[in-house]
């Protein structure tokens, strides 16, 4: 069933993540959109994804490595990665957490 609306607070999403015991948890799916909260511990081990991806930084600072580039980030920044592009977070602070939005068809738009 399609949702008419959905809301989360950062605290609610963080609590769900803590309960999961994982570095990420999927909070919502509808159509091609998937919303997650992601909080790696120590090292970011993610691999390229099949869909386009948007990050919105919740907390923390660090370096975003993507497509041969290195970009400093901090709370409130928005980062885009096309499907299939290797990327990772490095040198991130212990409080680092980000929203993740996957969307579109596999292979990207």
Regions found by a protein language model. Give the residues of each.
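Short strand-coil-strand connectors
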Residues: 29-31, 65-69, 92
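Histidine-centered metal-chelating micro-motifs
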Residues: 43-44, 79, 83-88
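Short acidic-glycine-tyrosine-enriched beta hairpin
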Residues: 68-83
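Short hydrophobic/aromatic-rich beta-strand segments that constitute the beta-sheet cores
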Residues: 35-37, 64, 98
């Amino acid at each position: 069933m399609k949702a008419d609306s959905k809301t989360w607070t950062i605290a609610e999403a963080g609590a769900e993540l803590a309960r999961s015991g994982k570095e990420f948890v999927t909070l919502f799916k509808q159509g091609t959109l998937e919303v997650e909260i992601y909080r790696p511990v120590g090292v970011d081990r993610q691999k390229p994804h099949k869909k386009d991806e948007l990050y919105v930084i919740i907390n923390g600072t660090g370096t975003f490595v993507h497509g041969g580039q290195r970009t400093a980030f901090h709370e409130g920044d928005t980062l885009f990665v096309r499907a299939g592009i290797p990327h990772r977070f490095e040198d991130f602070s212990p409080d680092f957490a980000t929203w993740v939005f996957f969307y579109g068809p596999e292979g990207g738009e």
